[in-house]
Amino acid sequence: MSLYEYKHPIINKDLAAPDPVSAQKRSFPTLEAWYDVINDYEFQSRCPIILKNSHKNKHFTFACHLKSCPFKILLSYQGANNSGSSEDGSPHGLSGDGGSSSSGSNHHNGHTNLAEDGRAEDEDDDEDDDAAVTAAIAAAVAAVADSQETIKGPFVVTKIEPYHNHPLESNLSLQRFVLSKIPKILQVDLKFDAILESLCNDDDNTVAKFRVAQYVEESGILDIIKQRYGLTEAEMDKKMLSNIARRVTTYKARFVLKRKKDGVYAMPTAHQLTGGDHHQVQHHHHPSIPAHHQHQLPEGQQRDVQHHHQQQQQQLQHQEQHQSHVDSGHNVYQNRIGSISDNDDSAIHNLDDTNVRVAAAAAAAAAALQSRENHDTEDLKRTLEQVQDDESLDVGVPDSKRQLHRRERDRVAEALKMATRDILSNQSVDSDVNVDVDLVTGHKQLSPHDDMAEQLRLLSSHLKEVEAEENVSDNNLKKDDIPDENIQPELRGQ
């Protein structure tokens, strides 16, 4: 892309060269006078020019908004004294592009209207909060406007490269160009940084309640845009106003974020504290005031200090009582733990002796029970065989044999009861002894209690079946008996 130079009566190659007649370079009495020239150049070319760097309010570097463009201007202070700031860095309100002196007068008029609107709203009882915020913004704007002074020169261009490498047709439209200049207007013309800083330092956190739409309408930024860039009322439609408000919101958010990163805006405000936190801050703040300063305070503040001091003493007493209660409870708990540990030691020794005795008794009882169960098992088997042999005596059995069978059954039942009682007594003895869980488990695994109990259940069920069958046979025998009435008289005596 070939380089081209936009034709302008001031911003050209001859700006850095001395005048042939006077042998001096063209100078600008103030920094705002230089910004008047830059603003006109931007407006005609639709190409934003930005302040790229500055040093001690004496040296400034301006460049095209496109990084690849070689356009560059170096502006330096020429004079013995400089009424501006001598600190390093860009001057306050000069990190963007500047504005004209005529727009500065409009800027003051806008602030006056804003202050009057703030006072009018302050008289409205239904909008106390809105009026307070508006008044705070108006006061901050007025303070910044009164404290700012014009940076005096003279300033001269020491170096200029007036060529662009992008075509003029690719530059911005008028509305987009105006939107790109909103940060410069906020920073230079309206001193928006100082306004936001004043609002951030407000105890009521006014910056959080800042209404951008109200600021756009009342700050004078619309008047500056109309006068400087020639926008008509039709061009300042709702979409344009919305885009302007969006630029203001972005600028405000970036400023507050920078303050938070620097740690200046990191402290919580009074309305953000909870009740407990608020009292805690006051609780630590007022006792730190020396006594001789407290006597110099007003009477109301002295009462507040004394009240919070009493609250502090009461809280300390409550903490001491709570600590003593906790300590006493802790001592009782420690003593209880010590006694429990002593009892556990003695119980462990007793448990060892008991386990030895129980193990020996369990072994002896298991051996005796095993021999007894073997003997009882043999008796039960023999009895079961006898009962099974007697099952053939169901019908037609004489009375003597039936009685003998009943006596045998009773004997078997009695033997069954005795065996059951012995087993239950042995189980109760085993349950009365406090045997270790492992010993009891091993004994249950090795003892034949389960087999014996199963045999007893089988025998009991078998006896019930035999008894039921016997009852059936008795009924049948009764039916087969011939009544005495039906017997012939000659046979009754037989």
Curated annotation (Swiss-Prot):
A GO cellular-component term linked to this record: nucleus
Coiled-coil ranges from the UniProt annotation: none
Renumbered residue ranges of the record's region Disordered: 82-130, 273-328, 467-494
MF annotations from Gene Ontology: DNA binding
Keywords: Activator, DNA damage, DNA repair, DNA replication, DNA-binding, Nucleus, Phosphoprotein, Transcription, Transcription regulation
Annotated GO biological process: chromatin remodeling; DNA repair; DNA replication
Signal sequence residues: none
InterPro entries reported for this sequence: BAF1_ABF1
Biased composition (Acidic residues): 119-130
Stretches with biased composition (Basic residues): 281-295
Compartment(s): Nucleus
A Pfam family assignment: BAF1_ABF1
Post-translational modification: Extensively phosphorylated on Ser and Thr residues.
Biased composition regions of type Basic and acidic residues, renumbered to the chain: 319-328
In-chain residues carrying the UniProt-annotated modification Phosphoserine: S400
Keyword Protein biosynthesis: no
Keyword DNA-binding: yes
Main location: nucleus
The family this protein is said to belong to: Belongs to the ABF1 family.
Role noted for this protein: General regulatory factor (GRF) that contributes to transcriptional activation of a large number of genes, as well as to DNA replication, silencing and telomere structure. Involved in the transcription activation of a subset of ribosomal protein genes. Binds the ARS-elements found in many promoters. Binds to the sequence 5'-TCN(7)ACG-3'.
UniProt protein name: ARS-binding factor 1
